[in-house]
Structures are given as structure tokens and as C-alpha cells.
Amino acid sequence: SRDNRTKVLAEIATQYERAIVFCRTKHGSDRLAGNLESMGINTCVIHGNRSQAQREKALEQFRRGKATVMVATDVAARGIHIDAVPVVVHFDMPEDPKDYIHRSGRTGRAGMKGTVISLIDKSMRRTTTSLCRGMKFDVIYDEPNFNLSEPAKPVRPGEIGAVVATLLKVESD
């Protein structure tokens, strides 16, 4: 469920200096950012309903570390260059494999290593496998307590490895 994915995302956010999180819709981006803020995680939001000034302010907050999580739609997947982003999280999977590649390309820039995590629940597994099949990813389905220090290995040298987290169960407090 979306609530379970939000809880896991909050945990991921605490393990990285900063993260870019992609959502499918503008409303979903705003809602997720609000939920993360209520959990004590500083966020900024970029999507098509934001003015250029609002987008620039959000980028500046993220670059300076005032916001540790940037929640965005695919607007941020192309043309935005931010160095040293250690992790990209696909909160909502895109429909097009090219969008997955562009989103994922926001991490691991300038010769640095990066991690890509896709948060899915059990019902999304078949669609995700189909999406990733053509991208030559080594897809690893893992539980929410996955070890982020062990990234997936590329299928072939020079390709991207992806970790897809399957949210089967999240313990409640």
C-alpha cells in the first residue's frame, strides 16, 4: 500500500544524505512530501504545477541541504543536474522504460556510484518485471529491511543494476 511504501521511504531517507524520489502525479508528489514532512524529513517538491521560481527555490534548498529529499514528477528527470545524489527512489514506477532510465540517471553522476530503489507492493511485481525486462537490469526483489550497502550487480559490465523492493509486510509501531 502507499502507506507502507511511505514508511519504507522514510527509513531509506534516513540512511542517505539526500535522495530524489519520483512520483507519477503532481498531487501524489505533494501528498508524499507532506507525509514525509510530518515524519520529520525535510523535503522540497518539483512538478509541472510549480512556477519556475518555485522550482529554482526547491533546487536551491536541495543543493544546500535544507531539503534532504526532493519529491518530483518526471519534470525533474530530464535537464536537472545535481551532483552527488546517492540514491534515486521510484516511489511510483513509470510506464515507459525510457522514463525509468532518465529518472535513474539522476544518481551516480560525475563518475560517482549511485543506488536506484523502486518501491513496489506485491500487486505491482508482474508489471515491474515486465518494465525492467527490456532494460537489462539485474532485478532483485527484497523485503523492506533490505541491505542498502549491497547494490545489485549489473547483468553485463557497464550496465546499471537495480534493486526493486517488494513491500510484502511492514511492521507497525
Each model region followed by its residue ranges:
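Conserved helicase RecA-like core
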Residues: 1-173
